[in-house]
């Protein structure tokens, strides 16, 4: 049984190599036309568009003050005073401060946490 399996494997390998050589020689002799993809233009790489500057900064992005951050409860957290500032999560009080002082990116409503409310 093993000998039969080895013999079939060898015959199959010889067949694969011989058919590959036929295709290569026919292609070199221009007997076969190269396959053209009719949808190649559809998948062509498009030129990247320049990113426009956003009016607000997402979480983890650079900021100058709380009004630069997008989320209602986001605050501008700075290391070493005013250096390495980025938007991080704040709280309800942050939202109220932003509502009072920010003219752009002003929160419409401030979400309240349901953790402290007693249900009953």
Curated annotation (Swiss-Prot):
Residues 17-54 form a propeptide. GO terms for molecular function: toxin activity. It comes from the Eukaryota. Keywords: Disulfide bond, Knottin, Secreted, Signal, Toxin. One of its GO terms (cellular component) is extracellular region. Its main location: secreted. Disulfide bonds join 56-70, 63-76, 69-87, 78-85. The keyword Disulfide bond applies. The keyword Secreted applies. It is found in: Secreted. Expressed by the venom gland. Belongs to the neurotoxin 05 (agouti) family. This is U13-lycotoxin-Ls1e. It comes from Lycosa singoriensis (Wolf spider). The lineage of its organism: Eukaryota, Metazoa, Ecdysozoa, Arthropoda, Chelicerata.
């Amino acid at each position: 049984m093993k000998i039969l399996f080895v013999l079939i494997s060898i015959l199959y390998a010889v067949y694969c190599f011989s058919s590959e050589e036929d295709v290569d020689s026919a292609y070199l002799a221009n007997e076969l036309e190269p396959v053209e993809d009719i949808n190649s233009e559809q998948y062509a790489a498009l030129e990247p568009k320049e990113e426009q500057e956003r009016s607000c900064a997402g979480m983890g992005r650079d900021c100058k003050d709380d009004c630069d951050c997008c989320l209602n409860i986001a605050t501008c957290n700075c290391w070493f005073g005013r250096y390495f500032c980025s938007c991080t999560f704040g709280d309800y009080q942050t939202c109220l401060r932003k509502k009072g002082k920010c003219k752009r990116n002003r929160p419409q409503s401030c979400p309240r946490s349901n953790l402290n409310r007693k249900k009953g």
